[in-house]
Design a protein with these regions (language model features):
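Polytopic transmembrane helical bundles with strong interfacial aromatic enrichment
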Residues: 1-266
Length: 266
């Protein structure tokens, strides 16, 4: 899936998002180029060797090919998420008024910013949960069918342990990612939780219906103090609201609509 969707996205950058690509090509192009030259070739070459190497390569070498493909996939994920993290939180760049483009000033600062690191950890944790579930599910099916019970029993145990460890990692990284979002993208968090006004403490929305213009809630079912606890790790922490941030951004950047599509974000 990584290889197939990556090929499609290469065309989308030029055809669907050409203006964006011209504006940030110097920045997003750097990690994507490394991903294409290093990670993509690593995973595609060794995945091919693994597929066509059955009964042709020595067993240890054949095993090494799928490990290298997996490493390539994780490297690929990191470089792609680094480019996405710049879109979420631009850093290590300068604007060139002569070319009307942004230019990269520090590749490693952009590559290893906090947003990229925690997003990668969160994504990989979810990937391991998926992998563990697939292994555990197939193993359970084999046990029920009575096929290779000894192997299936051990792989079921491995898959179950992977799910538990990855789930704990997913919860921790998700919490860390949310707190980084509150600092770097407060409007995104406010929209995701349908918090229209700055609150301290801030409630966690279970279900909210808002007006069509996205200016206020009509009905809301909340958990008191919940969002403050998630966003600040305190029961009475302040979380900025959509309307307050809209007014702040208008004063800072000029008139305009700085709200995301609230129903979709929520």
């Amino acid at each position: 899936m990584c290889v197939v969707t990556g090929i499609v996205q290469e065309f989308q950058f030029g055809m669907n998002w050409s203006d964006f690509s011209r504006f940030v090509g110097d920045i997003c192009g750097a990690p994507l180029a490394v991903e294409g030259l290093l990670a993509f070739f690593l995973e595609s070459v060794f995945l091919g060797l693994w597929i066509f190497g059955w009964d042709r390569l020595p067993k240890k070498l054949h095993l090494a090919t799928i490990w290298l493909a997996a490493i390539g996939t994780m490297l690929s994920a990191y470089f792609i998420l680094a480019a996405n993290s710049f879109m979420q939180h631009p850093t290590a760049y300068t604007f060139n008024p002569e070319t009307n483009r942004v230019e990269l000033t520090n590749f490693f600062e952009m590559l290893f910013q906090d947003t990229a690191k925690i997003t990668f950890w969160h994504t990989i944790s979810a990937a391991f949960i998926t992998a563990g579930a697939v292994v555990a599910g197939i193993s359970a099916w084999l046990l029920v069918r009575g096929k290779s019970p000894d192997v299936a029993r051990s792989t079921l145990k491995l898959g179950s342990i992977t799910i538990l460890v990855a789930a704990a990692s997913l919860a921790w990284s998700g919490d860390s990612q949310a707190r980084i979002m509150v600092e770097q993208q407060p409007m995104k968090m406010a929209a995701a939780e349908a918090l229209y006004e700055t609150s301290a403490p801030a409630p966690f929305s279970i279900f909210t219906i808002g007006t069509l213009d996205g200016s206020e809630p009509i009905f809301s079912l909340d958990i008191p103090h919940g969002l403050s606890l998630l966003a600040t790790h305190t029961l009475d922490g302040e979380v900025q609201g959509i309307n307050n941030l809209q007014a702040q951004y208008e004063e800072q950047f000029g008139p305009g609509n700085y709200k995301p599509n609230i129903p979709i974000a929520y």
